[in-house]
C-alpha cells in the first residue's frame, strides 16, 4: 500500500512539475525570447511584450478551470488530469518547433500567443485538480502533507525550469538550444500520459451523482469561500512570480549579475523551498493548517522586502541569505495552501469551484506580476534599499490576504471528507 501511495504521488504530481518547469523556463528566458519574437530597438518594450504573452496564458486559466473542472466533477478526476496533460504536451511541442520572427515575421508572435493561450487552458485544469485528487486519496491525519506534494512538485518544476534556462544561457550555446527544454518537456508529458492512463484511473474518486448547483445558488452559499480561494490564488501567483521569475530580471538589471548566474541563485532558493514544504506540511497536520498559513502571510509582510535588500549587495553570502528567506516564506505559504482550498467546497463542486476561483486570482494578479514588477521598478527605480517597489507589491497582497483569512476564519464552512 505504501508503494502504491508513492506511485500515486509521483504520477499525480508529474503534470504540475512539468507545467511549472515550462512556465518558469519561459519566464527566465523572457529576455532571449523577446529578441526572437519581438525584435525592437527598445529592450524594455520587447521584454514587456514577452511578459504580456506570459500573462495571457494565465488569463486563460479560468477557461481551462471550468472545462476540466466540469470533467473532473461530473466524470472523474483522472479523466480531467489526463486531458489537461495531453493539451500541455501538445503546446510544448508546438512552441519548441515554432519558427521565429526572422523566419515568418509577425506570424511568429501570433502563433506563440496561440500556444500560450492553450497552455493556460491546460494549466487551469492541472494544478488544483492534482491537489484535489491527492488530498482525497489520503486519510485525515495526512491530508495537508498529501496536498503539499503538489506545492513541492511546483517548486521542483521551477528548479528544473531554472536549470534548463541556466544551461541555455551559458556562453557559446547554439542559437536553437532554447527549443530543447520545450521539446523535452513535451516528450515527458506524453510519457506521463501513459502512466496516468494506466494508474490514476484505478485510484480516482468518481464524480458525485449530485446535480450541480446553478450559479445563483452557488454564489449565495459559497461566495465567501470562492473569494477566499481567489485571494489565495492571487497572493500565491504574485509572491512566486515576483520573487522568482521577476527576481532574475532584478538580479540581472539592478544588481549586475549575468543572466545564468542570477538563474542559479534563484534555483537554489526554489530547491530549498521544495525540501521545506513537506516538513512544514507535516507540522501543519499536527497544529492546524490555518494557523501555519496565517503565520506565513505575516512573515511574508515583514520579510519579503529583505529578499531584495540582501540581494542588492550582489555578493554570494547576501544572495544566499536572500534566497533562504524566500525559501522559508515560500514553504510556509505553500505547505498548507492546497489543504485549505480543497476543503472549502463539497466534492461534487470542488474541482470547478477551486480551479475557477484560484485561476481567476492567479491569472489576474499572478500572471501579470512580472510585468507589473518590471513597470514599478522602471518607474520608481530611484526607490531602493528595503523599499524596492516589487517587494512592497508582494507585501501588499500578503497583508490583504491575511486580513481576508483572519476575518473569515471563524465563518468558513469546511467539507472535510471527499464524499461530503
What are these regions (language model features)?
Residues 27, 224-273, 366-370:
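Extracytoplasmic gate region of multi-pass secondary transporters
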Residues 74-86, 286-298:
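Cytoplasmic membrane-interface "Motif A"-like loop-to-helix N-cap segments
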Residues 290-336:
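C-terminal transmembrane helical hairpin of 12-TM major facilitator-type secondary transporters
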Residues 122, 144-166, 188, 355-369:
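Glycine-rich segments within core transmembrane alpha-helices of 12-TM secondary carriers
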